[in-house]
């Protein structure tokens, strides 16, 4: 298994990126300014993009695993890699997600309504607010 940084032609992984963020123009907002990593385990299985949000905050903007390989720990391996790589440079690792019943703390009201051109659904529930989860590094 190998995790490698992708510097060029990041859109070749668009099929993976759209698993986590289904609207391409939203992906375009962070794709080039972010640092992209792919996890290769006999082929690319997962990806993530992180951005520097200032004030010591590193944000996971996109993280996805191919459907046939989900729940096998690939995303966890990417997160562990990010923590190890960036713990000296940043004090917080955060990720934003939808307001599904399984998520909690910091909520940005109406994020999905205000920023997407169509309703976004997860497990049959329309996402409205953005929830931020943080880990101190």
Residue ranges and their predicted role:
Residues 85-99:
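Conserved GNAT acetyl-CoA-binding A-motif
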Residues 1-26:
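Short amphipathic alpha-helix that is part of the acyltransferase structural core
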Residues 63-70, 98:
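A short, internal acetyl-CoA/4′-phosphopantetheine-binding micro-motif in the GNAT/acyltransferase core
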Residues 99-100, 104, 108-137:
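C-terminal "cap" of GNAT-fold acetyltransferases
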Residues 38, 43-64:
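Conserved beta-strand in the GNAT
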Residues 69, 73-81:
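Conserved acetyl-CoA pyrophosphate-binding loop and the N-cap/start of the following alpha-helix
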């Amino acid at each position: 298994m190998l995790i490698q940084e992708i510097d060029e032609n990041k859109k070749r992984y668009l099929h993976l990126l759209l698993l986590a963020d289904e609207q391409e123009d939203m992906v375009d907002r962070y794709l080039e300014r972010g640092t992209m990593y792919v996890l290769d385990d006999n082929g690319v299985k997962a990806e993530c993009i992180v951005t520097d949000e200032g004030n010591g905050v590193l944000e996971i903007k996109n993280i996805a695993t191919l459907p046939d390989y989900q729940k096998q720990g690939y995303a966890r391996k990417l997160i562990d890699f990010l923590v190890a790589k960036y713990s000296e440079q940043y004090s917080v690792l955060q990720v934003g997600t939808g307001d599904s019943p399984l998520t909690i703390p910091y909520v940005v009201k109406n994020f999905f309504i205000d920023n997407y051109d169509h309703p976004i659904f997860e497990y049959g529930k329309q996402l409205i607010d953005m929830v931020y989860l943080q880990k101190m590094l």
